Amino acid sequence: MLEAARWAPSHGQTEPWRFAVFTGESRAQLGASFAEAYRQFTPPAGFQALNSEAQRDKVWKAPVWISLGVLPTPKPTVSELEEIVAVACAAQNMMLMASSLGLACKWSSGLVNTHPSVARAISRKQPLTLLGFLYLGWPKSSWPSGKRAALETKVSWFE
């Protein structure tokens, strides 16, 4: 999967993706960083210990978690948006590869999974922007069928 990610397109071949893979007991550290992020962005009046515990414990739902980090290039000709899009392409490549291998894979973002404190916890050397995490494992049941709006509602044709 990581090899598939490596071949995603990036403007100027900047390859801005940075991944951290969490398996086994290392997920406990990741869960602690999720709980800390929840504590940091939740006002004291709204803080709920049960939600904090849920953030900490969610890492045990899947055996593998992969962070989706963006390390933008200093090149002035490449925008930060292009770097984010490149990492999104890398994530899509990983998700397609996971599916081809029969693995269940979910991209989880949100305030906790993209919080700067989580980024600092997993990448002390380089300041990253997190787009979230892929978590994956073997599906417990048959894969649900997807639903999408009709293509005609999403495409305009010009001649």
Where are these regions (language model features)?
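N-terminal amphipathic, basic helical "cap/leader" segment at the start of enzyme domains
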Residues: M1-K61, E159
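Small-aliphatic-rich amphipathic alpha-helix that forms the alpha element of a beta-alpha
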Residues: A5, I66, P72-R120
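Short, surface-exposed beta-edge/turn micro-motifs
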Residues: P16-W17, A62-W65, N93, L131
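Short loop segments at secondary-structure junctions
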Residues: G24-S26, L71-T73, W138-S141
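Acidic-glycine-rich active-site phosphate/pyrophosphate-binding loop
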Residues: R39, W60-T73
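Short, electropositive alpha-helical surface patch
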Residues: V118-L131
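C-terminal helix-cap and adjacent tail motif
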Residues: L130-E159
